[in-house]
Amino acid sequence: MKYFKFLIFIILIFTNFINASALIGPNDEIKIKKIEIYLNQNYANTDTTTYPLTKGMLNNTLSNKSYDVDHILYRQKVNSVFENETKRHEIKLNVFSEILPVRNIDDAWNGKNSLSYQISYQGNNLTYQFKISSYENRVNKTDYHFDESYIAYTNWNLVFGFGSLNRWWGPTHNNNLILSNFARPSPGVFVQSLSGFEFDGLLSFIGKTNFSLFVNRLESNRAVPNPYLIGSRMTFIPFNNLQIGFTRTMMIGGENRKENGDILIKAFFGALEGADNIVGSNERTDLNSFEHDPSNQIAAIDVKYDFLFKNNLISFYVQK
């Protein structure tokens, strides 16, 4: 609740002079596919494996042809798919007999029956979205949450924000190794690239590079209450149609565990030496063993290749 109050406070402060940059969630995956087909037709590509995406990234994909007819038509295509609305209200009602055990990329986390109201605003530099949902939990009681509410600011080709975002990191449509919508999003801060970075010289071969980083606070009803969840992902597009992604997440800190820079450094670099996620001599992980088990983390790599066949988009991918 304290995160929600803080979010409302920020929105009230900036409502009168907001300019915004939109975040595109995994529920808009069908729209993104339309953009991907158009890009493949024009021999271009952009990162579509790290949701939420940014509209700035889509708009700037052909920015090196800013006065080219192809780029003008592409911008019109993006604007036609994602309506240029500065303010939007949305009400959704979902009715299910059971909680969905399997979800696709465009499914939101909900209980058996849910009702949600959403208001969003976007402009040039600052955007916000407020969403409140009521749903039936597993014991058939009505509960409320503010998932998918956030506020974000754009500058220096970066997006900074705070909120609870649905993330889908990976090339698939119905499952991922690490981050998907199978669990509710947790509140936290995040930063990600807006339209990607390109390097000259020796690093030019890696192509356009995008990154996303977040630090979230998890819930209290777990073995170690209220740990931090840190997630990072980098993607590279060395040439058109090929996307390579690297993902890493770690849980660190929590009740009765250290939360400082030393532990973070030990967790980040110690994993490379096999000093993380270890089991003690008694074949059990000691929750208080900060020195030998500073965090719980996993990593993944994925590769996606797209091509057109008779105006149909075909994708091959692998993740490990």
What are these regions (language model features)?
Residues 107-115, 142-147, 183-192, 226-230, ...:
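Residues that define the transmembrane beta-barrel architecture of outer-membrane proteins
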